[in-house]
Swiss-Prot record:
Self-association state and partner proteins as the record states: Oligomerizes as a right-handed, spiral filament on DNA at oriC.
Region described as Domain IV, binds dsDNA: spans on this chain: 359-478
Any single Pfam family the record assigns to this protein: Bac_DnaA_C
Species this protein is from: Flavobacterium psychrophilum (strain ATCC 49511 / DSM 21280 / CIP 103535 / JIP02/86)
Spans annotated as Domain II: 82-140
Region (Domain III, AAA+ region): 141-358
Any single Gene Ontology cellular-component annotation: plasma membrane
GO molecular function: ATP binding; ATP hydrolysis activity; DNA replication origin binding; lipid binding
Alphabetical UniProt keywords: ATP-binding, Cytoplasm, DNA replication, DNA-binding, Lipid-binding, Nucleotide-binding
Protein's name according to its UniProt entry: Chromosomal replication initiator protein DnaA
PANTHER family documented for this protein: CHROMOSOMAL REPLICATION INITIATOR PROTEIN DNAA
PROSITE patterns associated with the record: DNAA
SMART domains reported for this sequence: AAA (SM00382), Bac_DnaA_C (SM00760)
Amino acid sequence: MHTMNKTAESVWDNCLSFIKDNIQEQAYKTWFEPIKSVELTDNALYIQVPSKFFYEWLEEHYVKLLKVALTKELGKNAKLLYKIKMENTYGNKLPFTEQLPSAHRSPVRTQEIDVPVQQKNPELRNPFIIPGIRNLKIESQLNANYSFDNFLEGDSNRLARSAGMAVANKPGGTSFNPLLIFGGVGLGKTHLAHAIGVEVKEKYPEKTVLYISAEIFTQQYIESVKKNNRNDFIHFYQLIDVLIIDDVQFLSGKTGTQDVFFHIFNYLHQNGKQVILTSDKAPVDMQDIEQRLLSRFKWGLSAEIHQPDYETRISILKNILYRDGVEMPEEIIEYVARNIKSNVRELEGAIISLIAQSSFNKKEVTLELAKQVVEKFVKNVKREVSIDYIQKVVSDYFQLDLEVLQSKTRKRHVVQARQLAMFFAKRYTKASLANIGSQIGDRDHATVLHACKTVDNLVTTDKQFKKFVDDINKKLSL
């Protein structure tokens, strides 16, 4: 068939019938039915898609399929060009079109995120300052006290700290982009995130660094939608060289904010800017965060900060005493370190409170005083039950050997015991599902999730099983 007789429509129809045979119907309906063919010139087919995100999705997931389909129709020099036609861009009532090359030809630099036509370059609004000031002075929001100097290294944070250092030395230039630091409360995620920012500012004063919590980011975004300046919001964030977002799990369930963050993230990543995220969960345990965002969180490095071990706890205490110029007997430091294990924040709180008590009451710090202070702290902290302890309690309750509980056996009573251990590990510890699985017989996170669901279901339908749960719960709550 000569190209002469071909129309954009006929070429695209043929492509579609090929594509339809090669993907699931639902995917076809979602991603291919909305596309319109626009024009055909030589060996280039223009297709119209409804949004920039739509284009990114096609390029990310279906570019090979599109290429094969088009090559069949137009030969090996086939080109696919996109026209993005947004019927209604945010705050801009006229539709507008922009053209983008497809990834499999040498792309001209694509335009930045959809700028409405009539808004060529008005004042850019910085969500942090009064609008109307032309020269954007962006306050980094960093806390200079949170530096690498006072972020002590130990086994519990070595990976995260070294990755943080590498990023601070070469922001955007390592494979740790994004760098996601995750772990329980009070272990130093925020401190490390600030430390990276502080270090970058020291080494590269010309770089724009911004620290912001996901909660404030969300509030700013909602505000920008209300005021009809979502684009300004996006452009502001595109100016940042090192963006640090704290507690990114706060975005869960907030689809609008996730969508805008997705665009900002893509832009920053493609332009070699650095993104640093902190979270109290590993990506695999985050609920209600879109898949496309989660997959991007995994592009770089996810580094977990664990609870500090005994040696690290001692160093942390000594460091605080040294900074405050206070001497304290070794046995007292050891006593505090042995008894406060859950997190760094409580450890610091206890020692600071101890120093305050002694200077305030003009008393020597004695072991007795240390016991009183530590008791106050430990009382207020729900005792962290370890996964090992949970497995031991469950095994004893069912009179099983620990090895049997962790084995691969599928005997019903063992499977139930194993599922209960997983269920209580999720309830009583801050460990990630993957971590729980690996400690209970080397299972994956999906197994743990399934176990928790099974236990939830059985508790409501099986009296005997509910008794198991209540009994073990009592033993663990002692």
